[in-house]
Amino acid sequence: LCLNSNGAYFEIMDVTDKANPQTISTASSPNAGYIHQGWLTDDHKYFYQDDEADLVRGSVETTRTLVWDLTDLEDPILINEFMGTMPASAHNLYLKDGFAYQANYRYGMHVLDITDPENPVEAGFFDTSPYLEGPGFSGAWSTYPFFESGTVLVTSLQEGAFLLRKKKDAF
């Protein structure tokens, strides 16, 4: 399977035959700006997406995370549009061990507790560019939470790379 985040819509494709991919389903999100990246929960039941341009275009007022239910691949259902607390343009997110690690450009990395995958809750953040605010495309670009040590890498376009580790029992 291939899960495509294609700007204005979400597409699920069967790519068994690489020369002839078949569309299984296409779904659209309300007020889409530019949806381009997402990540599956470990059980593959939910797909989390960020929209990079919805805030810049004025479609929403804070960072929006889309949560799709993939129980029926022929009919994915948008079950939540989680709204963050900051007016941050979102870029990339990755899920690991019940948390979503989001690169939110000028507001750094935000961490969501997704132990209840249909109802995310903000759990923490690290601001890579405290001198920048508002929507825009500078600051935290991506995260990598997959080191066995628990260290999380956050890359920031102007500031470089940050290696972070949460405090014990912080969230």
Segments predicted by a language model, with ranges:
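Feature marking well-ordered beta-strand scaffolds used for ligand recognition
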Residues: L1-F171
